[in-house]
């Protein structure tokens, strides 16, 4: 049965869904990496696809930009379509000095300036964590493919253009690896609905050093990350 934001039918989604922010990136993943692909939803042009990877059923769907958008799609996938594993695949801006362009960052935990998880938890702090089984498998797959990987805390920002000029230095001091805009919200939804979630990010720029990937290196880095995510998805 369709939801307000997803017009797929029951059974259209695999138990594991890979979720980039950009719906066109979801289309790229489906067309590049999956076989026997079927488009299962297109409401608001937020495309979703299901196919197979090495013979195993996998789905991919965009979640939009920011915690509110991501939470809507993740909630509906889990609550209405029976999805059990959500793996966000995206990019981040690095802040810690030992994190480099093209590294893969896996968000073991996610800090945030959003109140979304405080709203869930009677205004208390909530430790937004990845599922350990997903995390362990992703690290294993990254190392098997010789992809440089860092595991630790990320920061999910509500504002892309932040007015807090000193926040990145404080993040670095606290050991935060990089900044995205969704992980903390996704982890909160998964915890609330008793599902599993993980965030895998490729480092597209270094905020403090002012470094950025070229378009060619950005694509290669994304493809490397996707192979890690897909191998994780089929080995759960």
Swiss-Prot record:
Instruction: One Pfam family, please name it.
Output: PNP_UDP_1
Keyword set includes Glycosyltransferase: yes
Please name the InterPro entries in this protein's record. DeoD-type, Nucleoside_phosphorylase_d, Nucleoside_phosphorylase_sf
Q: Which UniProt keywords apply?
A: Glycosyltransferase, Transferase
The top EC class is transferase
Give one GO biological process term.
purine nucleoside catabolic process
**Residue positions of the active site:** 205
Residues the record lists as binding a purine D-ribonucleoside: 5, 180-182, 204-205
Q: Which domain of life is it from?
A: Bacteria
Output the SUPFAM superfamilies linked to this UniProt entry: Purine and uridine phosphorylases
Q: Which cysteines are joined by disulfide bonds?
A: none
Cellular-component GO terms for this entry:
cytosol
EC assignment: 2.4.2.1
Q: Which reaction does it catalyse?
A: a purine D-ribonucleoside + phosphate = a purine nucleobase + alpha-D-ribose 1-phosphate; a purine 2'-deoxy-D-ribonucleoside + phosphate = a purine nucleobase + 2-deoxy-alpha-D-ribose 1-phosphate
Q: Which residues bind phosphate?
A: 21, 25, 44, 88-91
Q: Where is this site: Important for catalytic activity?
A: 218
Q: Which GO terms describe its molecular function?
A: purine-nucleoside phosphorylase activity
Task: Name the family.
Answer: Belongs to the PNP/UDP phosphorylase family.
Subunit description: Homohexamer; trimer of homodimers.
Q: What does this protein do?
A: Catalyzes the reversible phosphorolytic breakdown of the N-glycosidic bond in the beta-(deoxy)ribonucleoside molecules, with the formation of the corresponding free purine bases and pentose-1-phosphate.
Identify this protein by name: Purine nucleoside phosphorylase DeoD-type 2
């Amino acid at each position: 049965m369709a939801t307000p934001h997803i017009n797929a039918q029951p059974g259209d989604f695999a138990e594991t869904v890979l979720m980039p922010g950009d719906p066109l990136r979801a289309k790229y993943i489906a067309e590049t990496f999956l076989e026997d692909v079927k488009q299962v939803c297109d409401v608001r042009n937020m495309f979703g696809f299901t196919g197979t990877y090495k013979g195993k059923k996998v789905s991919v769907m965009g979640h939009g930009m920011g915690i509110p958008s991501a939470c809507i799609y993740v909630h509906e996938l889990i609550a209405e379509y029976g999805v059990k594993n959500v793996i966000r695949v995206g990019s981040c801006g690095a802040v810690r000095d030992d994190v480099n362009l093209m590294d893969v960052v896996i968000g073991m935990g996610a800090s945030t300036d959003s109140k979304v998880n405080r709203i869930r938890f009677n205004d208390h702090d909530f430790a937004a964590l990845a599922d350990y089984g997903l995390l362990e498998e992703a690290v294993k797959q990254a190392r098997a493919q010789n992809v440089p990987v860092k595991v630790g805390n990320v920061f999910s920002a509500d504002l892309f253009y932040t007015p807090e000029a000193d926040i990145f230095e404080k993040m670095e001091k606290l050991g935060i690896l990089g900044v995205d805009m969704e992980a903390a919200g996704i982890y909160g939804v998964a915890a609330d609905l008793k599902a599993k979630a993980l965030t895998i990010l490729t480092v597209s720029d270094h905020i403090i050093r002012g470094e950025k990937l070229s378009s060619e290196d950005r694509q290669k880095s994304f493809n490397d990350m996707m192979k890690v995510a897909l191998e994780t998805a089929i080995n759960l």
